[in-house]
Each structure stands twice: as structure tokens, then as C-alpha cells.
Amino acid sequence: MKVARFTKDEDLPEYGFVQEEKGKKIIAVLSGNPFAGDVDLSGERVDLSEVRLLAPNFPLKIFCCDDFMDFYLKPATCAMGPDDVLSIPDWSRGIEVRPGIGIIISTPTRNCPISEVEKHILGMTCILDSTALSDRNHVCNTAFDDSLAVGPWIETKIDPDARLTLGKEKSESIRNLLKCALKNISFISSFSTLLPGDMVAVRSQNKQIFELPGEAMAKIGGVGYLRSFVRREVP
């Protein structure tokens, strides 16, 4: 099942299930926020082409990881949705962009052993995480606004054999990234409560460097593709 967050005509964000109908994608709209409690189908159905997709979750916390216990915290203002702009800060030489997986938490998670982690997961999404290339400190280089693209939606059925692709060429299995995410969720929960909608992301070692405007794209098999437009920030 694919869970999307979207807006129609710039209205308030809504949630829905992405479904196939007569060869095209439609959204079966939900009656509320699935991270805030039980929801039902509202009965409304909209064509995917008629909405603007947003980041599929609105996290209070985003932990990004390169390896087990090697992670950093990004604020919610970093996150944006598909086809939005990844910013090159005006104080940087450019940005390094890496694809990855984002694991979305479904229930409050504290002191959770690895064997129980999957019970607290809603699903997986695709990310494009950017790091500024500058002489500033690590926090500045990773936590700046609009530095993390998330989407296109959350896939609740996680396939460990799915492949993650950066652009059109660099492809890898997500199996090791997923193992790392599960271990980090358990470890993070030992000192910080993870709440519904929070995300633990693991980045690939594949990367692209942008010093000029361009386009970044990643894809996870069975989930979907995520595209971002890279633009330099105007001071």
C-alpha cells in the first residue's frame, strides 16, 4: 500500500492511498492524518495528476545515517517533497547529493530491541539528502533549509531485495541500508523517543556533486522515483 501526502490548489495537506485505476494512478483520500490516529476513506478520489505531492510525512525528527551509530539530526525545515528545489546555500561552493531510504515510524518507539523494530514501522520512502560543500561546521552543512527531498510516497510493504538507483546508472540493493536502518532505530530509541511520522534515513555511498543548477533523481524499485531540481539560493 502506498500512502501519499498532497495538496489540491494549495489547500491544507491531505493524505490518501495511491491506487491504479484503468491504467492511471488515483488517490483514495483519507478522512484525516494517519499519524494522528485511526482514519477511514473519505469517499473522495482524485487523479494523481491533479494534485501536488508533498513530503509523505511531516517529521518532528529526522535522523540521517551513513552507518551504524554514525548519524546526524536534521530539522523538519530540511524536508521537502517531489519536484521541489534542493537549495545550494549562497555561502557554499555547491552540494553533495546522495540517495537513500527513509524508514517512517508509525508508533511511539522507546527502548526497542532490534527484534521488535519492524512492529513500529509504517513503511519506506525514497530520499535525496544534500550536504553543503563549505568550510562551515557539520551542523550548518547538513541542517540547512530544503536540503532533504522525500517521496514520492510511503510504501508500507518493504522489499529488502529492491534496488536503489541514483540517476540512470548507479544501482544497488537496499538490503544493507535496511539492516543499518533497523539497527539504528533500535539504538536511537535507547536515548530518544521516536514518534509517529519521524524518519530514520540511511544514505547510499553513491553521490552527485552540484556546483551549478541541475536535476537529481533517485528511484527505489516497488516504491517509485524522486526528482529534485537543484538551484542556487538567492541571498
Set out the residue ranges of the language-model regions.
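Extended, compositionally biased flexible segments
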Residues: K2-P99, E211
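A generic local secondary-structure boundary/capping motif
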Residues: R52-L54, L86-I95, T109-E116, H138-C140, ...
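A short, structural micro-pattern
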Residues: L73, V97, E118-H120, F144
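Short Gly/aromatic-enriched secondary-structure transition segments
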Residues: P113-T125
